[in-house]
Amino acid sequence: MLLNSNELEHIHSTNHSVNDISIRWGVIGAGQKGNKEADLFAGYKFSNGTTCYPTLAVNFAESDMMHLQNIIKEDRIHFDGLKGAARTPSVVTDLFDPETNPNANGYLDKLAQELGRKFTNEEGEVIVDQFLICLGAGGGVGTGWGSLVLQLIREQFFPCPVSMLISLPSGDPDEINNALVLLSEIDEFMREQDRLFGNSDIKPLANVIVNDNTQMQRIIESQKGTKDLKNRYVNWKEVANDNVVSTLHEINIIPENYGSDNVTYDPSDLIKLLSIPGRFLTIGKARIAKFDLHSLENSIKRSLDEGFFSAEHQFETATMYGGFVLRPSNADFFKDVNTENRIRNTLGEYKRLDEIAGKFGDPIWDNEYAVCYTIFAGMTMPKRYISLAREGKELAEKQEQLRAEAQRKQDEEKVDISFATNRVQKNTFNPYNKNQGFGGASRFSGGKNSAFKRQTSEATSTQNQQEEENIISTLKTSNPFKKR
């Protein structure tokens, strides 16, 4: 059983049984980043030992999945003959595009069969409420998979709504470009979805949750050496994954397993919040050890502005909110009217709560501190999109300047090697040729070739033919994943 947060350690160290969740996520991790997050979801188990989330990993580089600890080999989807996408999303999208690949439907059939095997029961019934797609926007497989998912939603491939968990890159121009294009495509999809579905309809693309690598690395660097991160060596990516995934798991198990003597936050409240808005969603998580209004307010603000889900969100565009304070049973501070008002007023600084739907509860647990989980949903594109575009442009301009400068220096320092070329071209000695004599036709007739030219043979290209013939092209009729 994976216990990768203080809260999960405490929950499972007590006699409190956890045998259900609010939303039955079917988790699919695409690309190296998505694989690692999905692997964490696969490690969560109920008190009875059964797995919380059915999970698949998808990757074009089989080696990227070798070190997964919780996803078994048969649940690691790899397409034969492919060895990665090299930060080129079109490798993914072209594979499933009938206009560019005549075998695209065969690949889609294989994907549908794998999803049907994992996410349906023996009667062919879907066993999940939502699909949670984890990916890194920037890599080839992750970015391409994000684009592919949008197209498959349009084709009604998925039998239930889809949520996306996306991490944004930092520092690499190619990855930033990929992320910007994917975010733009998501924004276009959301606008189209808004035209087709009403405010109270469950959306095919339920929500998109964004994590910013730059922000998460900054948090972990500031925490290194503190009581939260005592280790001498810290892999910030692993710590970030633990924080993001454990927070999502916590908000999913608490409403189902913890009640309140004041205001209960039901599983149905969470399901509604994560199903209807159809836009960007963010989560704030704040541990509260000092029970006073000032500490409470600052903790909530810090979790939203400087947390692991912070990405310069436009809170004023939110259409729903929700959350709860997981509090000690003897902490009457959280039931006090002034405390309730302070929480509402603090959230109201981000978005006037009387303008949007939502609910805030206060479930009880048997620990000494409290944890506040805050969710805003239905927001438009985060402003991080704008600043990321600015960073990408600056990096591209810097790269071009460096290339031009290097070319200029090379031109200035050009070396005359004509003497060497002349000597090499006149050298006719070959130790592997037998001496055939010096008579006969002129030895200098014919066209001139490079002195280093090698004998070449015609290449053949039949590598993928047999592999493509082995792909399953039909599905069982009970499979709910729609074929083209």
Curated annotation (Swiss-Prot):
Inducing stimuli: Probably part of the tubR-tubZ operon.
Subunit structure comment from the entry: Forms filaments; a 2-stranded filament forms with the non-hydrolyzable GTP-gamma-S which is probably a precursor to the 4-stranded filament that forms in the presence of GTP. The 4-stranded form binds GDP. In vivo polymerizes to form dynamic filaments that often extend from one cell pole to the other, moving in a unidirectional manner. Filaments polymerize at the plus end and depolymerize at the minus end, a process called treadmilling. Polymerization only occurs above a critical concentration, it does not require upstream tubR. The tubC DNA-TubR complex binds to TubZ.
Keyword set, alphabetical order: Cytoplasm, GTP-binding, Hydrolase, Magnesium, Metal-binding, Nucleotide-binding, Plasmid, Plasmid partition
A Pfam family the protein falls into: TubZ-like_C
Localization (cell): Cytoplasm
Protein name: Tubulin-like protein TubZ
Domain remark in the UniProt entry: Consists of two domains: a nucleotide-binding N-terminus that hydrolyzes GTP and a C-terminus domain necessary for polymerization. The domains are bridged by a long, central helix. The C-terminus is required for binding to the TubR-iteron DNA complex; its gradual deletion leads to decreasing binding to TubR-DNA. Interactions between the C-terminus and the following monomer drive polymerization. The C-terminus is required for filament formation. In the absence of GTP's gamma phosphate the intersubunit interface is weakened, linking GTP hydrolysis to treadmilling.
Enzyme class, broadest EC rank: hydrolase
Residue spans of biased composition, Polar residues class: 452-484
Residues reported in the UniProt entry to bind GTP: 32-33, 140-142, 213, 237, 241
Native source species: Bacillus thuringiensis subsp. israelensis
Biological process, per Gene Ontology: plasmid partitioning
